[in-house]
Each structure stands twice: as C-alpha cells, then as structure tokens.
C-alpha cells in the first residue's frame, strides 16, 4: 500500500509539470517587479484676462493681443508652459481664477485685499496712473478733491481695482458710479454725455479714442485719482496651481524683467 501512495504522488507531480509552465510555482517566490508610474502629462495652464487696451484685448483678427499679452507670451514660452489665453469680462475672469486650479489671471493689481487669494508673479507692467477724464467741453466741472466727484456720475469697469478703491472712499454703484462689464462702452457713454467722468489710464483712453476715430483733444484729465506706483500689475495664480509651474513662471518673469525695461 505504501508503494502505491508513493507512485501516486510521483504521478501527480509529473502530470502537473506537463500541464503548468515549469516556472509557475517558482514565480510566486520571486520578488514582484516594481511598477514605476509614468510622469504626469504637462499641465495645461488656463490663462484668463479682460479687455483693457492697450495692455490686453482682442484684436481685429480675433487674437488676444496687447502690451501685457505679448509679455505674457514671452514669459510663459520661456518657462516652457503649455497654456491657452481667453478673454472674459473682469468679474468672470476673477471668478474663474479664484475657483479653478491651474489658472492664471493678468493684468491684475496686487492689493492687500487680494493678497491672500492668489499666488503672485510680479511685476508684469510698469506703474500706471488713473485719472478722472471729462469732455474738454465740460468747463462747468471743477474738482478740487476726489470727494467733489461724488456729485457727478463716473463710468468704470465693474469689479475692477479702481471700483474697489472708490467703494472704499464712499462712492456707490447706481448713485455716482455707472458700472459696466464692457470696457468699450465707457468711452461711448462719456462722449454721449451719459456720464460725467470716465476713470482709466491715459494710455487706455487714448487707445479707446483712436479705435473710434475720435481726436484725443476731446477729453482731458480732471483729476488724478491714484498713482499705482506701489501696486504693480501682475500675473496671479489660483493657490492650488502646481507650485513648480508657478516657480517656473516666476523665474522666467524675473529674467525677462532683468533683461528688458517694462513690457
């Protein structure tokens, strides 16, 4: 009986070796290979901006153009970033930048109120000065202070940094502020006499007049509202944007600013 059991065991072993690959049993004893995940694909950076001539705007060919836009292209290309630029009304651009990771917004002024909401890359633009512009024909308007402007109607972009500033100084929407999401409508309102002032930079209002074939002499500065020497226009990122991507952009921007003077 003992010989039968031994023979049967040898027979089963031989049968298993004929059916299974010879190294199957040994495979379980070998260390399993370590699978190294492939690197993540390049991050596509979403870039948003607004219509703010001559810094960022949509040209006649439907392309995003402007002095700031050109610099953004140069910086992001130098950083090796994959990106796409889209233009939105300012309030929508801000909402996208504040709610969607891997998003960058420009040209945005770095203020204490905005500081904690973004990761910053500065400066993008030279300092700018904003003025209250009026029609040259409106000699009846006299301003000695910003408070004097509260007696009039001022047109400006909703949600812009100067909107935030005027609200902090006691101005009110619907009372002495005429707010719009469309920057191109502001100059039209001023020329039509629907508002008393337009608040913007000299570069912006002169470019707006040029676009509609109106002479610069039609408007003059009634009051310098704010010198933004201490609040430079920047590029800003959603806080959850890839940190290495942000650092790449910062390095590229610093190098660009070192090599060139302004945008």
Predicted regions and their residues:
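Extracytoplasmic small-molecule ligand-binding "clamshell" domains
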Residues: 29-117, 179-180
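Short helices/loops that flank or line small-molecule/ion binding pockets
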Residues: 91-103, 184-204, 211
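Periplasmic-binding protein-like
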Residues: 49-51, 127-130, 214-250
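Short coil/turn segments
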Residues: 51-53, 60-65, 110, 135-140, ...
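Bacterial N-terminal signal peptides
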Residues: 9-21
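Acidic, polar ligand-binding/catalytic clefts
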Residues: 73, 86-148, 222-229
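Ligand-binding cleft/hinge of the Venus flytrap
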Residues: 70-81, 146-150, 159-181, 209-216, ...
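Extended ligand-binding regions for polar small-molecule ligands
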Residues: 66-78, 138, 151-152, 160, ...
């Amino acid at each position: 009986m003992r010989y039968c059991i031994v023979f049967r065991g040898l027979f089963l072993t031989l049968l298993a070796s004929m059916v299974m690959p010879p190294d199957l049993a040994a495979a379980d004893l070998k260390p399993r290979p370590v699978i190294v995940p492939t690197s993540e694909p390049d991050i596509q950076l979403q870039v948003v901006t607004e219509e703010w001539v001559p810094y960022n705007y949509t040209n006649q060919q439907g392309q995003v153009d402007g002095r700031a836009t050109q610099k953004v292209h140069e910086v992001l290309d130098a950083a090796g970033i994959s990106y796409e630029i889209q233009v939105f009304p300012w309030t929508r651009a801000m909402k996208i930048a504040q709610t969607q990771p891997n998003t960058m917004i420009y040209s945005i002024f770095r203020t204490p109120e905005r500081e904690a909401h973004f990761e910053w890359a500065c400066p993008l633009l030279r300092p700018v000065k904003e003025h209250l512009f009026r029609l040259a024909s409106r000699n009846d308007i006299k301003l000695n202070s910003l408070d004097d402007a509260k007696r009039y109607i001022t047109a400006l972009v909703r949600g812009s940094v100067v909107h935030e500033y005027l609200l902090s100084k006691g101005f009110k929407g619907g009372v002495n502020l005429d707010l719009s999401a469309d920057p191109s409508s502001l100059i039209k309102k001023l020329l039509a006499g629907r508002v008393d002032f337009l608040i913007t930079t000299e570069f912006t209002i002169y470019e707006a007049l040029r676009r509609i074939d109106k002479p610069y002499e039609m408007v003059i500065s009634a009051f310098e509202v704010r010198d933004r020497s201490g609040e430079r226009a920047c590029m800003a990122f959603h806080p959850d944007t890839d940190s290495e991507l942000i650092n790449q952009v910062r390095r590229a921007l610093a190098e660009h600013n070192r090599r060139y003077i302004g945008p």
